[in-house]
Structure formats: structure tokens, C-alpha cells
Amino acid sequence: MGRGGPWACAPLFVLLLLVGGGGERHRAPRWKCPIVCSCTQDNALCDRTDGVPRGLPPDITSLSLVRSGFTELREGSFLQTPSLQLLLFTSSTLGLIRDDAFVGLLHLEYLFIENNKVGSVSKNALRGLKGLVHLDLRGNPFHCDCRIKWLVEWLSSTNASAELGECQGPGEVNGTQLSQLHLQDFDCITTALALFQSLPFQALSVEPFWYQGEQHVAITQPFAGRCSLLEWDHLDGAFRAYASINAPPHPVPTGSSPVACKPLVVEGRLLVVLAQLAGGSHVWRWEEASGRFVRLQELGPQRIRKPNALASFRVDGDWFLAVADSSKAGATTLFRWGGRGFYAHQALHAWHRDTHVEFLELAGQPSLILASSSQRPVVYQWSRPGRAFLRHTDIPDMDDVYAVKHFRLRGDVYVCLTRFIGDSKVMRWEGSMFRDVQHMPSRGSMVFQPLGIGSHRYAVLGNDYSFSQVYRYDARSGLFVRFQELNTQAPRSFAHLAVHQRDFVFAASFKGDTQIYRHITIDLSA
């Protein structure tokens, strides 16, 4: 396994003598030499050709192409000369070597591709060269990115000696000898969100949940007036709806306009809270025997005026439900599970037209963040003696925040703050307050959703007036970098769902089809 050898500095004419036979190198060939070539019995040297010369005999053992005008070697370029033992390209415009370019050259021992324009070599270009003794690629402007990783791997496993020259980019390896690169120098695994399935309806929210060992998803359909529950269909390999709330046999209230449905499993029972702008908000219970949902209770009929968002959580063993109320005279209300239903526990933040509520823990303390259209986001913390949330602080310099989503990274708590126009922000909790980390431009944004998929961390900023932006966290800089665009019309929610070792991202669209993307892994060196 060498990257240099006894032939590395050997003069080319010596190799030609060894391959062609020194005593017979001037003997006239028995075949007609192409007009652009000079030929002996076993050798051909061709100058300024526009391609691999045709008409060469199959028993030629040495071929040299100098100052050629063609730019690529295609598959099977030398099938007519299977006896070649030495092949040379030099001082030409050759820039691309495709897969299987040298197929059929079972006897080739010396391959010189020097001082050309080659920036990369296809992964299977050298396939079939089992007898190769020496490879020389010096003098080429190699771009040492993932497309060249295979060559570094090949060098570590071959017995052939090699001279490869130096990298001409990218920046971090510019000027490095290609022979000094190692596999760990390449980061060639990336990811993408690929469209997997479209659902023919508009949606506002997407809520994944676990029930009986399977993951499901609840989707709010405002124009259809219902909440649909979807599961993975193992036979069709796609998601399908298996139940609906506010659908036949239950009549749809006129103008009900559901805005959120929140599934939760309480005491082993599946409940779904359906918040509506009209017709009342209700709690529904799944009945296994009948395979449908039945209405359990109306939720706070005297308290909820214009619900906009829901959050469910557990504190000190109790289940709570928070309903953000966006009416001018309303108040965000906290309900507690009492065994047979949810009952009002605390009123928060009256008269501020709250648009979103997020539950999180700050330094181990249960907390709520309320986003409002009339003031900065407010942080509440749980008081155990009073069994209530008390105002703790607000988030500075962030008026008109529509929604708040949080995530944890390396022990720190971050929030994604959504603004419709201007800049949405990522902020980090630093003991007593949130501080800026990063700004992202919003173009009609109503959702800024952090997503954790495997070891990858993303943040998706939905835009009504441009493409939605997927950002991926870069551990080296500690920032999110723009990664991909999604063409989802008027997105209102993004959610991650894992099914049988496959990861999906649901994108709820308010004006078009709701879309499901599959998270895929791509090897850029393949």
C-alpha cells in the first residue's frame, strides 16, 4: 500500500522502453497509424487529438496522448486496445474522467494523467484496473471535496504506488498534498427533507402523540370543521386517517372553525381537546369498544372566548391544560384534570389578546411563556406553596411575538420567537432572562419550529410571502445556518414524527395541501 514507489520519478522514456521493448521501438508497424499519431510496432504517441484515436490495433501496449483537445473520458474509451500496459495523458484539456473509463484494460500497469484540467475523478473510474502498478495524477487542479473521498480510501487499500499532487480547494485544504488527506478529513453525510405525501386538505396544527405503543398525529382542519387522527398504514406505506372529531355521525357546528386539537393520554385514556372559535371548545374521549370519540365535557364555557392555542403538561403529578385566549376581553386560562374532566384552576394575563402559550422548565422550575399581540412575551413560574403560576419576567425587545417554541441543547434552554414581519429570533436562557443568539428574517411568519431528528437539530421558519426556510444547527459556530427551502403554502405548524426507523416532518398548510416530508440521509461521496 504505497503512495510513492520506484517508478515515481522514472523518466517516461525508460517506461516506454520497458513496455515496448528497447530493441524494436523504431520498427514500422504492420497496421496503418492514425494521421495524428507517431507509431512503432507496439507504441503510439498522438498529438492534439480531439478524442481517443480510432483504428489502433488491439495488441498495442503503450499509448501516449499529448496536448489533446477533448475534455472527458467516457465509459469504455479504450475497449479497442485491451493490451495496453502504459497509458499517458499530459498537457491536455482533459477535465472529467467518468465511471469505467478504463474498463477492459486488464493488463494496464502504468497510468499517467499529468498536467491536465482534472478536478475530480468519478468513483468507479479505476474499476477493473487489477494490474495497476503506478498511478500519477500530478499537475491537476483537484477540488478535494467529498467527490474525491473515494480516491483517498482507494489509496489506503491499494498496492499501487501513486503520485497525486496537491489540492486546489476548497479553502481549508487548499495547497494540501492529496496524499496527506485522511478519511476523517471529509464530512460527507448530509440530510434533506424530501416530499413524501400530500394530504388534500388545509390545516392549522399538527400534534404527534403516543398511544398504545404506536405514534399517531392529530391534525386540525379549520375549513372542514374537524380534527383528524392519522396513523401509519403498514400495507400501503403511507399515512391514513382512522378517526375524526366533529365529523359524521357527529354534526359539524355551523362556523365552528376549530383552531387547535390537543391529544393527551390521561390515566391510560386517550383524550383530545378541540378548541373552536364557535360552538364551544370540548374534551373528547376515545372509546375502544366502538372505535370512535365521544364528547366528555365542554371546556370552560364562561371563560374561553376566542381560543388560539393549547398546551398540556404535568406539574407535581397533576395534568394541566392551558388555553391562550386572543379576545380583547379574554384571559388565558389554566385548567386542571379532576378525574372526570378539566376544571378551571387559574386565570392568567387578562386583556392582552394572547396568541400562544408554551410550557417549559427553566432551571428545573415549571414555567409558562405567553405570547401576546399587545405586549412583550411574559414568563411565569410555578409557585409550589400557592400551586399557581406567578409572573417572573418578560422577554425584552420582542414586541408583536406571535408564538414561542422551546428546545434544549447541551443543557441550555433556547426559545424560537416568531414575528410575522421583521426578525424572528433564537434566544437562550441565562439564569434570570433570555438573551439574543440569532435573528432570522420573517416574511409573513406564524411558526418558527425547532425540530430534533436523531442527532440533527433544525429550526423551520414558515413564511407566507416567500419560501419557508429550514435552518440546521452548526455545532462549530453555535448558530443555525440556512439549509433548505420548503414550498408549503401559508404554513402554520411543523412537527416531527418517527415511524419504524423512518422520520417524517408534517407541514400544516392554511391555503393548500398539507404536506409530509421524509427526512433522508445523503452520502455526498457516493
Go through each PLM region and give its residues.
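Repeated scaffold domains used in trafficking and secretory/extracellular systems
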Residues: 201-208, 253-262, 303-312, 352-359, ...
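Blade-level signature of beta-propeller repeat domains, shared across WD40, Kelch, NHL, RCC1
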Residues: 464-468, 484, 488-526
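Beta-strand-rich domains and repeat architectures in extracellular enzymes and scaffolds
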Residues: 47-51, 196-228, 257-261
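Structural motif
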Residues: 225-231, 279-285, 329-336, 375-381, ...
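Beta-propeller domains
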Residues: 194-196, 214-246, 278-288, 332
